[in-house]
């Protein structure tokens, strides 16, 4: 999977794919790829909860990739940050 420079370079569907790739790497034999993906996730989302969005979701949120995207989208909009690429 190609990692993009900014969250604005991802469509929502592409970001869901990134989250699914993270899920897949969670069960890999090593964490080498997972570490890179998680660092990228934290960097481009800029969300203060970081990887807790994935591993420790709030009780009132869907913990699916789509639920994570929804929370990121809402937080970025509320904080005046650019959103996902339209596509």
UniProtKB/Swiss-Prot annotation:
Entry keywords, A to Z: Bacteriocin immunity, Plasmid
Segments traversing the membrane: none
GO molecular function, one term: toxic substance binding
Top-level lineage group: Bacteria
InterPro entries: Colicin_E_sf, Colicin_pyocin
CDD domains registered for this protein in UniProt: Col_Im_like
Family: Belongs to the colicins ColE2/ColE8/ColE9 and pyocins S1/S2 family.
Secretion signal, residue range per the UniProt entry: none
Coiled coil: none
Described purpose of this protein according to its UniProt entry: This protein is able to protect a cell, which harbors the plasmid ColE7 encoding colicin E7, against colicin E7, it binds specifically to the DNase-type colicin and inhibits its bactericidal activity. Dimeric ImmE7 may possess a RNase activity that cleaves its own mRNA at a specific site and thus autoregulates translational expression of the downstream ceiE7 gene as well as degradation of the upstream ceaE7 mRNA.
Protein name: Colicin-E7 immunity protein
One Pfam family this sequence matches: Colicin_Pyocin
Any one Gene Ontology BP term: bacteriocin immunity
